[in-house]
Amino acid sequence: GDVAAGASVFSANCAACHMGGRNVIVANKTLSKSDLAKYLKGFDDDAVAAVAYQVTNGKNAMPGFNGRLSPKQIEDVAAYVVDQAEKGW
C-alpha cells in the first residue's frame, strides 16, 4: 500500500478514535505494534493484511469500512498503520 495516501485516509476516517495510534473507545487496544500483534490474527505473518482485514470487517466497537473505503484505500491505510506502529507512533 501507499503509506502517504494511507495517511490521508487515516486522517479522514480513523483519527477520531485512533489519533496518534491511541484508542479512545477501548484504551488498552491501541495501534501499537505490541497490541496489534496481540489482538489481530495473523499480524506476525502479514501485518498489512491483518490490519486491512480488521479495517474491512470491523470488530466489536469498531465498524467495518467495507463499502465505505475502496480496497485500495484500505490497503493504503493498513500500510500507514503498520508503518506508524513500526516507528512507535
Swiss-Prot record:
Give the signal peptide as a residue range, or say none if absent.
Answer: none
| GO biological process terms on file | photosynthesis
Keyword match Electron transport: yes
UniProt PTM comment: Binds 1 heme c group covalently per subunit.
**Binding residue positions for heme c:** C14, C17, H18, M62
Assigned keywords, A-Z: Electron transport, Heme, Iron, Metal-binding, Photosynthesis, Thylakoid, Transport
Q: Name one GO cellular component term.
A: plasma membrane-derived thylakoid lumen
Entry's family note: Belongs to the cytochrome c family. PetJ subfamily.
Q: Which HAMAP family match?
A: Cytc_PetJ
* Described function: Functions as an electron carrier between membrane-bound cytochrome b6-f and photosystem I in oxygenic photosynthesis.
Q: What is this protein called?
A: Cytochrome c6
The organism encoding this protein is: Limnospira maxima
